[in-house]
Structures are given as structure tokens and as C-alpha cells.
């Protein structure tokens, strides 16, 4: 399997530098604890190099635009082969950079098209005590035990044509795992019981966004007017 240091090694090395004396806060979902991209840590380094402000660096196989999530001493991330046929979750020890779990979750015989500026592992996972929830869009969603890496449940029945590749990250609200699917054929929001993976509710949405199948606009529309002096 092809192994590359970018983008994940660079992200992990840059984000998990040594902070003294207190460790940085957990980062459990896309854009952090409150989903707003705000980090409360202060006095962080502004420069990095191979010998400066890097505690460890770990190469991760595959290609992914998803963000790592952090809880306690674990850093979890998703990755995929560049052809989209193998989709994985990886857990790294926060203090040492050692890989704890490297789990191939889904195999996809005929991956959908994915734009070159996207990846087959772009949705960021969401983690809570004892469980992590990962999704790759239509190819599959899974809940894992963070200690053992065991798959607690999975779903592969949310089908849509992602057109340019999946990118929507899940969120947790109370007992629900909520996901958004914006396909060119089907669009919907679905809420799952986070403990069992069973569907609690699903809301369909219109797919009329005035694009043709080739991606070219059906018509030109003016959405705003601006005066510039």
C-alpha cells in the first residue's frame, strides 16, 4: 500500500507540537468543540521545522482532506486509497505518534467519481468518550470502539451520487448522529441513534440546484448587486 507523509503527517506534526506545561484541549469534531474553529490555547508556536516545535511526525498511508479529531491521548483520522477502493480509520497516540489502530473499514468495488481537488476521505469524524463515528458518504458510515477498534455498527444504505466526492462531516446532538447527503440525484439529512446506528428520522430535500450532469450551469443567475466607488 502506498504510504505518503502528506497531508496527514504535516497536519499532525504541526498541530501536535509540545505544549508546556498543559496539554491542548480536546478537538472532537470538525472545527473543534463548538464547531466554530476556536481554540482556547494560548502561547502557541508560530514556526515549525524538522527540529523546531515538532514533538513527533508519523506518516499515514493514502490521501484525505478530513481533519484529525482528538480526545484524551488519542488522535483519530480517516484516509483512503487514491482510487477510493479502500477506506480506513487510523488512531495515533497523542503523546508518542505511535499508530494504535489502522483499520480498513470499507472496500468499494466501483468508487464514484471524485474531483482531483477532493479525496475519498474528506468528511471529518466525530469522537466522544469510548466511541468514534466515521463516514465516507455513500460508501459507508461506522461507529468504532475507541479502545479496541471494534466496529460496533455500520451503515452502507445511504445512497446518493456525490458528483464530485463526499465532504459533509457528521455531528452529535444528544443521542443522535446527524449526517447530510448532498447528491446530484438524492439530497437528505438523516439522524441515527448513535448507540445502535438505527434511523430515527430522515428529511428529504429537493435536488433542483440548476446544474446539468456535466457540471455546467443551466442558466446564469444574478444573486446580488453591489455598487463600488
Residue ranges and their predicted role:
Residues 9-18:
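Bacterial N-terminal signal peptides
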Residues 22-229:
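Noncatalytic, solvent-exposed loop/strand surfaces
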Residues 8-9, 37:
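A periodicity- and composition-biased signal for non-globular, repetitive helical segments
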Amino acid at each position: 500500500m502506498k504510504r505518503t507523509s502528506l497531508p496527514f503527517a504535516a497536519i499532525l506534526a504541526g498541530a501536535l507540537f509540545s505544549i508546556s506545561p498543559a496539554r491542548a484541549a480536546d478537538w472532537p469534531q470538525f472545527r473543534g468543540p463548538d464547531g466554530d474553529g476556536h481554540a482556547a490555547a494560548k502561547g502557541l508556536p508560530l514556526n515549525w521545522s524538522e527540529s523546531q516545535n515538532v514533538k513527533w511526525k508519523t506518516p499515514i498511508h493514502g490521501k484525505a482532506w478530513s481533519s484529525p479529531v482528538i480526545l484524551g491521548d488519542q488522535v483519530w483520522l480517516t484516509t483512503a486509497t487514491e482510487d477510493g477502493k479502500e477506506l480506513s480509520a487510523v488512531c495515533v497516540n497523542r503523546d508518542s505518534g505511535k499508530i494504535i489502530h489502522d483499520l480498513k473499514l470499507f472496500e468499494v468495488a466501483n468508487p464514484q467519481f471524485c474531483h482531483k481537488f477532493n479525496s475519498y476521505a474528506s468528511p471529518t469524524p466525530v469522537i466522544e468518550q469510548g466511541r468514534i463515528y466515521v463516514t465516507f458518504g455513500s460508501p459507508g458510515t461506522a461507529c468504532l470502539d475507541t479502545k479496541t477498534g471494534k466496529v460496533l455498527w455500520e451503515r452502507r444504505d445511504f445512497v446518493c451520487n456525490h458528483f464530485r466526492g463526499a465532504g459533509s462531516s457528521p455531528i452529535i446532538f444528544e443521542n443522535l448522529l446527524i449526517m447530510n447527503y448532498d447528491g446530484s440525484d438524492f439530497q437528505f439529512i438523516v439522524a441515527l441513534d448513535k448507540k445502535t446506528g438505527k434511523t430515527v428520522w430522515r428529511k428529504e430535500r429537493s435536488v433542483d440546484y440548476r446544474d446539468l450532469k456535466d457540471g455546467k450551469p443551466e442558466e446564469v443567475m444574478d444573486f446580488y448587486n453591489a455598487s463600488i466607488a
